[in-house]
Structures are given as structure tokens and as C-alpha cells.
Regions:
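Canonical Rossmann dinucleotide-binding motif of NAD(H)/NADP(H)-dependent dehydrogenases/reductases
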Residues: 2-34
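Substrate-binding pocket helix/loop in short-chain dehydrogenase/reductase
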Residues: 94-95, 99-104, 189, 197-200
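Short, small/polar-rich loop/turn modules that mediate ligand/substrate recognition or access, typified
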Residues: 170, 175, 230-232
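Residue(s) in the substrate-gating loop at a strand-loop-helix junction
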Residues: 138
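Active-site helix of classical SDR
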Residues: 118, 154, 162
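C-terminal substrate-recognition "lid" of short-chain dehydrogenase/reductases
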Residues: 115, 208-237, 242
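Alpha-helical segment proximal to the catalytic Tyr-Lys
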Residues: 123, 167-168, 228
Length: 243
């Protein structure tokens, strides 16, 4: 039997990149998936590609009402047992180049959005008998990131939120773990020049970018019962960059 047969998963930032790869793998393993994103055309196209096992809902992760609608849609399909907090923004700037508006934009999407998502799914996961939440952080949440000050601050916050939520939710049968990707070939990094990406790889012992599928397979492991004794963990998938 497929690992996720009969289960429902909710992915924020699910319209493209890493979220889309996660959705494809989950559907292939029997899950029904709610794709949440602000990218309506891309999200609708992906849902159409995946067929009846996937639905797209416009989800602005900074709005509680959007989360409530997405969770209700997921619960209508069956027991919601998995959430991937994948939505995020990345605008690399030094601290002295970062204004308050840019900092608040990062905290709203990357940090507040994650909090609202976790809070929204807890009641339905409890009704389902438990579940798994995977928060997508970054290696910027494991070490300093001078050139991406606001982004790094929010990814450190996700790391701490994950551990605190794991402590609170373990008695309710809900596991919470964080994934910390290094340089991954996704649309988020398209803002960098090829030269910038090549320079970054000099600090990666494995000498290459990771793929969205490599990260997605780790996410599926954390969503599955194969990781049933893991909570509060922070897993780097970075080619050795944080060694």
C-alpha cells in the first residue's frame, strides 16, 4: 500500500518549485493534496496536472481566514494528517540595506505564516488522531547570514518555533520538525546570477546544488509514519555546507 493512501496533506507555497515537487510525490504515493499559494495561475495548472487527487486554494499565509478556508477544504477530503509550511520569500540584503518594511515583509510571510499554519491545523489533526508538521527553514537558520539579514532572522525563528511547538503538541499526537535546505535549484534562487550561484558552491563540500526532489523526499519521510519517533528535529540537507 502507498505510504499516504487515504491521507490528506496541505502544502503552503505549493504552486511551484519545491512545494510542487512535494505535491507530485505525495499524490504518487496515494495522498490527496491541497495546494495553497498566492500564485493562482500556476497553482490551478498544477492541480489540473495532478488530477482529482489535488485541489488548489488561494492561500495568503499571513491571513488567518485563508488558512481556515484551506483547512476546511482539506478536512472535507478526509483526515488531514500533514502540513508542509513551505511558503516563503527571500530578498537578500545586508542589515544596513534592510528597511523596516522589508524586514516586516519577511517576518509576515516566513514567520507569522508558519505560526498561523501550525495553529490552524492542530484541531483537525487532533480529530484525525495525530499528524505531522514540517516547517521549511534553511541553512540560514543554522548559522549567520550577513547578506540575507531579514531572511536569516526568520529562518532562525522557524527553528525555535518548531522546537517549542514540538514540545506543546507531542501530547496531542502531533509531531513538528524542521528542514534546513542549503543551495537548492528552485525559482527562489533565480534572482542570483550564475556567477553568484557558482561562488556559493565553493563552500559546499559536495560541490553542487541540491534538487527540489531531494528535499521533497526528506519532507515525505517526516510526513510519514517512518519518522514516527521524531519530533523537534532540525535536519540539514545542504551537501555538507554547515559542517
Amino acid at each position: 500500500m502507498a505510504r499516504f493512501s487515504g491521507k490528506v496533506m496541505l502544502i503552503s507555497g505549493g504552486a511551484r518549485g519545491q512545494g510542487a515537487v512535494e505535491a507530485r510525490l505525495l499524490v504518487a504515493e496515494g495522498a490527496r493534496v491541497i495546494l495553497g499559494d498566492v500564485l493562482e495561475a500556476e497553482g490551478a495548472a498544477l492541480a489540473s496536472e495532478l488530477g482529482p487527487a489535488a485541489q488548489f486554494f488561494k492561500l495568503d499565509v499571513t491571513k488567518e481566514a485563508d488558512w481556515a478556508r484551506a483547512v476546511a477544504a482539506a478536512e472535507a477530503l478526509g483526515p488531514l494528517t500533514g502540513l508542509v509550511n513551505n511558503a516563503g520569500i527571500y530578498v537578500p540584503k545586508l542589515m544596513m540595506e534592510t528597511d523596516a518594511a522589508l524586514f516586516e515583509r519577511h517576518t509576515s510571510v516566513n514567520q507569522l505564516g508558519c505560526f498561523l499554519g501550525m495553529k490552524a491545523v492542530v484541531p483537525t489533526m487532533e480529530r484525525a488522531g495525530g499528524g505531522s508538521i514540517v516547517n521549511i527553514s534553511s541553512t540560514a537558520g543554522l548559522r549567520g547570514s550577513a547578506r540575507a539579514f531579514a531572511y536569516g532572522a526568520t529562518k532562525w525563528a522557524l527553528r525555535g518555533m518548531t522546537k517549542s511547538a514540538a514540545l506543546e503538541l507531542a501530547p496531542r499526537g502531533i509531531r513538528v520538525n524542521s528542514v534546513h535546505p542549503g543551495p537548492i535549484a528552485t525559482p527562489m534562487l533565480d534572482i542570483r546570477t550564475p556567477e553568484e550561484n557558482a561562488a556559493r558552491l565553493t563552500s559546499v563540500p559536495m560541490g553542487r546544488q541540491g534538487t527540489a526532489e531531494e528535499v521533497a523526499r526528506l519532507v515525505l519521510f517526516l510526513l510519514s509514519d517512518e519518522s514516527s519517533y521524531m519530533t523537534g528535529s532540525e535536519l540539514a540537507i545542504d551537501g555538507g555546507a554547515t559542517l
